[in-house]
Amino acid sequence: MTRFTTTLVAALAGANLAAAKCSYKWRAHAGDTCDSLSSDWSVQVSDFIKWNPSVGANCSNGVTAGQEYCVEDNGAGSKPTTPPTGSPTTLTTAVTTASSTPTQPTDGAPSPIQDGVAKDCKSAHSCKAWYKVQAGDTCDKIVSKYGAFSTDDFLKWNPAAGSDCTGLWVDYYVCVGVAGTPTSPTGSNPSKPSSTQAGVAKDCQKWYKVKSGDTCDKIKNQFNTFSLDDFLKWNPAAGKDCSGLWVDYFVCVGVPGTPTSPTGSDPSKPSPTQDGLTDKCTKFYKAQKGDTCQKIVDSLRTFTVSEFTSWNPAVGKDCTGIWVDYYYCIAVPGTPANPGPVRPSPVQDGITSKCNKYYKVQSGDYCDKIINKYNKAFNLEQLVSWNPAIGKDCSHLFVDFYICVGVQG
C-alpha cells in the first residue's frame, strides 16, 4: 500500500471504531461547536474529538449543522439524561417535528426544551413545573395562566423565548417554576382566578369570564357599574381598541369603591342595556334569540320601528345591533298603554303605531281617491303623517299594501 492509502484506511478504521463504540449521537444545529456540544453533554472536548474524528485535530474542521456527532461512547457510562440545548434550524422544523408525547428523561426533565433554559429547571430536584407550549401561546398568556410568577421571571428562566417573546416554539417545554416559586397564584386577592391576562388590577375584587363575542363595551354595559376607561385601566392587556380580549380568561370588573349595582338616574333601569338608550324610557323589553326591530314592533303594536330605533340608537338604523338578553326601551311618556289592532301585512315602513284602521291599496288608487272613499274623515296631511312612506305627493302607494286610514283618539 502507498502511505496515502495506509493513512486513509487507518482514518476510516478509526472513524468506524468510534462509530461502533458510540452509544448516543446528537444532530448538530447551526451555531454548534466542539466546545458547546462538549459542554452541553458534560464531556471532555478531547473525548468529543476522539469520538468524532471528522471534526479534525483540535476541531480544525469544525461542526457541521445537520450532521450527527457522538456524545457518548459505550464505555463512558449511561446515556446522558439531559438533552442538549441547541436550537432547531427553523421554527417550522421545531413545530412539525416535535414529538406530541415528549420523552421524560430519568432526571425528570422533559424533552424537547429550548436553548438556555434555567439551570434550576434542568434538575428534577429543583424544577417546580414544566409547560408544553401550545399553538397561539404568548409569554403573557402563559404567565397569566399560572399567575405565580412574572413575565421577567419567565424570560429569565427561558431566555430563548426572546425579550419580545417571538421565540416560543410549539410542542417544546418551557420552565414555569423553579425552587421557591409559589404553588398558587400570587397577589393581594386570594380569590383571583388563575386564567387572567398580564397587568390586571392587583386590587380587583370582582371578575368576569370572557365569552365568545364579548367586547369591552358589551362587558361594560352588562354590568353598568364602571366606565370603559375604568375597564381598560383594570385590564390593560385588552388594549385601547379592545382587540386583546381572550375567550375563557377572567377580566376585572370591580375594584374597591366600584358600585355594586348599576348606576344611572333611574334605579328601576334593568341591566344590561346598550349605549345611548333614551333616559325617558318607561318600559323595557329583554331581547330574545331571533328578534328583529320589526318583530318586536309587530308583537307589541304600540310604537313604530323608527320610534324604537330612536329610543335605542345602538341597534342601528338597519337594526343589526340587537343583542340577545339585553334590555331595550319599548315605551316613553305618551306611548299607548294598550296594543292597537293586529297589524295586517304587508305595510310600508314608518306607519304610525296608533293606527286602528287599515285599507288595502288597490290598482288605480291615489290619495285623494282614498280620502274620498272615507268621506273625507281625514285630509292628505293626516294621511301622509300616518303613512310617511307614501311621500308628500302620494307617489309611493304600493298596490296590495296596507295603509293607515284611522288612529286612536
UniProtKB/Swiss-Prot annotation:
TM region(s), chain numbering: none
Pfam families: LysM
Induction / repression: Expressed during in vivo infection of insect hosts.
Knockout or disruption consequences: Lead to relative tolerance against H(2)O(2)-induced oxidative stress. Impaired fungal virulence in both injection and topical infection bioassays using the last instar larvae of the wax moth Galleria mellonella. Impairs fungal propagations and ability in suppressing immune responses in insects.
Region called Disordered, residue ranges: 74-111
Biased amino acid composition, Low complexity: 87-106
Domain LysM: 24-71, 129-176, 206-253, 283-330, 357-405
Entry annotated with the keyword Glycoprotein: yes
Function: Secreted effector that enables the plant pathogenic fungus to manipulate host defenses for successful infection. Required for the full virulence to infect insect hosts. In contrast to Blys5, Blys2 is not able to protect fungal hyphae against the hydrolytic activity of chitinase but plays an important role in evasion of insect immunities. Binds chitin. Coats and protects the cell walls of insect pathogens from host cell recognition.
Entry similarity comment: Belongs to the secreted LysM effector family.
Note: In plants, chitin acts as a microbe-associated molecular pattern (MAMP) that is recognized by lysin motif (LysM)-containing plant cell surface-localized pattern recognition receptors (PRRs) that activate a plethora of downstream immune responses.
Protein name: Secreted LysM effector Blys2
Organism: Beauveria bassiana (strain ARSEF 2860) (White muscardine disease fungus)
